[in-house]
Amino acid sequence: MKIANVLTLSFAAIIAASSLAVVVSPITDNSRETASSSISQSPPSQWSKKQLIEYCKKNSLKTSGSHEELVIRVQNHLRTASKKVDARP
């Protein structure tokens, strides 16, 4: 009977500790990275074609072409967009 009580208490402690860890840990979903977050962290030359097309759609740019053409289009857009921001008073 002592062994059963020790095992029961051990399992209860494990369950309590794991529940506490879940409650205390921040809730994040790192299982999938959004395109916008990965886009903001790397230069367009490292984006996937899907990410480039998504950026083009959001900014009303032409979405067809090779990966290299899309990279150039996005880089040009980013360059002109940053110039517009700098030119504002």
From Swiss-Prot:
Give the top-rank taxon of the lineage listed in the UniProt record for this protein: Eukaryota
Tell me where in this chain the SAP domain is found.
44-78
- What protein am I looking at? SAP domain-containing new25
Native species: Schizosaccharomyces pombe (strain 972 / ATCC 24843) (Fission yeast)
Q: What gene is this protein translated from?
A: new25
